[in-house]
A protein has these predicted regions:
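Conserved N-terminal structural module of periplasmic/extracytoplasmic solute-binding proteins
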Residues: 1-106, 121-122, 312
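Hinge/lid segment of periplasmic solute-binding proteins
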Residues: 15-17, 74, 96-152, 298-309, ...
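Extracytoplasmic/periplasmic substrate-recognition and gating elements
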Residues: 82, 256, 294-336
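Paired acidic/hydrophobic, glycine-rich loop segments that form the ligand-binding mouth/hinge
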Residues: 92-95, 276-281
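A ligand-binding cleft/hinge motif common to bilobed small-molecule-binding domains
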Residues: 101-105, 282-299
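Short, solvent-exposed loop/beta-turn-alpha elements that line the ligand-binding surface or hinge
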Residues: 114-126, 169-173, 198-206, 224-245, ...
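Extracytoplasmic/periplasmic solute-binding protein
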Residues: 136-146, 151, 178-235
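Glycine-centered hinge/linker elements that transmit conformational signals in sensory
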Residues: 181-188, 229-263, 308
Length: 336
């Protein structure tokens, strides 16, 4: 819990602070988050460890509460800010995305996190992760990254090898989106040929977890910001030729059966043997199956991790996404 370990650290940066914590009378901090299941258990364990060690030593006691889903958390925060009937009071710390932080800060409800970290400490993080917490009209840091990720390409290595041995396909061909599309077509035709008595029963090769990421990052790789925001105004730059290029490497292979999306996530489609590879969040690797389960039985598989494919001739750009944590403005003792 990075932000929790920073609790009290601000005192080292601002020694003239009048706040003095008392281990015998600890200050209580409330944290809202959206974790559930194993993630919630791990987060609760980190809080318990903090309370029993550094928190106990300094006089800080943290209580964590899940609000359910990301949407539930955003609504709880929005209701608290608006003072809606039945709403809870704002927590001291909450997990959030940049859009929610921006809305809350417009109401003047957030504390500046800049004093919590030295410039050297901030420099240890990916710059774009930190910069997301700053807003164009303010030099204060309002969102600190704690759960960021990018995208990767994951492949069922076991079944890929069978396909590669039979057709001469190479992993190098998967470095570009056009190469993935061509490989997916070849895979469909190859699997279709395995059952000559059944026409058009080829299998899909590839899937994409986030269509929005595909279009936004694809345009960026071609040098265009699909959503261009300047002075608070949004301009959609939908260059017809570039959009068509993205369309031809997304919609067309989906229609032809070369790409597919069946389950909620593409890792689900790997598990059922419906696809061989996909592009998704780094966090999705936790759910990549070690077995494929079909009507014909169950078989063990291995995996390959690669960088996501880039449009041929395009700039190597990947998405950065995920949540951070924000601290609400209250009093010196709770913000300390």
């Amino acid at each position: 819990v990075l932000l929790l370990t920073a609790c009290g650290h601000i005192g080292n940066i601002t020694p003239d602070s009048k706040v003095k914590l008392n281990p015998n009378k600890p200050v209580s901090l409330t944290v809202w988050h959206y974790y559930n299941g194993a993630q919630q258990a791990a987060f609760d364990q980190l809080i318990s460890e903090f309370n029993a060690t550094e928190g106990k030593e300094k006089g800080i006691y943290v209580e964590g509460y899940t609000q359910g889903s990301v949407g539930d958390l955003e609504k709880a925060v929005s209701d608290a800010v608006a003072g809606a009937v039945g709403a809870q009071s704002l927590p001291d710390i909450f997990s959030t995305y940049a859009d929610t932080v921006y809305a809350v800060q417009k109401e003047g409800k957030l504390a500046d996190l800049t004093p919590y970290f030295t410039k050297e400490e901030q420099a240890e993080y990916v710059e774009s992760y930190i910069q997301e917490g700053y807003f164009h009209d303010d030099s204060s840091l309002y969102l600190f990254p704690v759960a960021k990720s990018t995208e990767i390409m994951m492949i069922n290595a076991t079944d890929w090898q069978t396909f590669a041995d039979a057709t001469g396909a190479s992993l190098d061909e998967l470095s570009t989106l056009e190469g993935v599309t061509e490989t997916a077509k070849r895979y469909y035709e190859w699997t279709d040929s395995l059952t000559p008595d059944v026409a058009d029963d080829g299998k899909a090769f590839y899937g994409i977890d986030s269509m929005s990421n595909y279009f936004i990052i694809g345009m960026k790789q071609m040098g265009v910001d699909l959503f261009d925001v300047k002075d608070g105004k949004l301009t959609i730059r939908a260059d017809k030729e570039k959009i068509r290029r993205l369309w031809d490497n997304y919609y067309v292979p989906y229609v032809n059966g070369y790409f597919a999306s069946f389950g909620k996530f593409r890792s689900d489609d790997i598990k059922t043997g419906d696809i061989l590879a996909y592009t998704g969040s780094v966090s999705s690797s936790m759910y990549f199956p070690d077995q494929v389960i079909t009507d014909d039985g169950t078989r063990d598989i291995d995996y390959i991790v690669m960088q996501p494919p880039v449009l041929e001739g395009g700039e190597h750009i990947c998405v950065q996404q995920g949540a951070g944590m924000a601290v609400t403005k209250s009093d010196e003792r709770h913000e300390y």
